[in-house]
């Protein structure tokens, strides 16, 4: 669609995509992917006077990060975060649990517990060391599994990415679009 409008674009696969069997994606961080995107900008600047970054979800977050560093002339963020990674995960859990009809009290208790647990993961604590005693019994098994999956370099870094802290540093034009019915990247 961009090419039909006379807009040049550079697309690339995620780091390690061509050799996915030997690459452990959980060891990469949002910062690593941001560096990958930043590496393309000097190449584009050789041919174009204005260079922007368009990204969806994590890519929208990366666009915000690059803009905050002054590396883009404009950005388009399609469902990128404008809050922290931790807040995003808690909000996604809240929306998913509410959508299946769980009582508000259960949702609130779970989200408060998972928020504290994610703080501990973000600070480097292992999933097996996190106390979830305040969690509703019915939700403990899925919580343990979720925390084990979150116990990775990628998630530890993601939890600490806080786009709200970057917004005041962005000086270029921004088009930020979010769908009202998209609960995954709200």
Place the predicted regions along the sequence by residue.
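Conserved alpha/beta-hydrolase "acid-adjacent" motif
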Residues: 184-186
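Short beta-strand/loop motif that positions the catalytic acidic residue
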Residues: 170, 176-178
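Acidic beta-to-alpha connecting loop that harbors the catalytic carboxylate
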Residues: 180-182
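Primarily recognizes the serine-hydrolase "nucleophile elbow" in alpha/beta-hydrolase
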Residues: 42-97
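Glycine-rich "HGGG/HGxG" loop immediately N-terminal to the catalytic nucleophile
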Residues: 16-28
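Accessory cap/linker subdomain of secreted extracellular hydrolases
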Residues: 78-168
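Alpha/beta-hydrolase active-site loop
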Residues: 27-45
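Conserved alpha/beta-hydrolase
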Residues: 2-19
């Amino acid at each position: 669609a961009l090419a039909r409008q006379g807009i040049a674009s550079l697309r690339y696969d995620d780091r390690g995509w061509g050799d996915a069997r030997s690459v452990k994606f959980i060891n990469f961080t949002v910062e690593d992917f941001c560096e990958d995107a930043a590496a393309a900008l000097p190449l584009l600047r050789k041919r174009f006077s204005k260079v922007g970054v368009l990204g969806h979800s994590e890519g929208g977050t990366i666009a915000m990060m690059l803009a905050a560093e002054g590396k883009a002339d404009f950005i388009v963020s399609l469902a990128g975060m404008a809050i922290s990674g931790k807040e995003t995960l808690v909000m996604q859990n809240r929306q998913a649990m509410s959508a299946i009809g769980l009582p508000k009290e259960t949702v609130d208790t779970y989200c408060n517990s998972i928020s504290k647990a994610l703080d501990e993961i973000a600070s480097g604590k292992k999933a097996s060391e996190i106390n979830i005693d305040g969690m509703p019994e019915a939700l403990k098994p899925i919580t343990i599994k979720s925390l084990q999956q979150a116990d990775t370099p990628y998630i530890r870094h993601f939890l600490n990415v806080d786009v709200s802290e970057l917004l005041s540093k962005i000086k270029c034009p921004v088009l930020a679009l979010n769908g009202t019915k998209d609960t995954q990247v709200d």
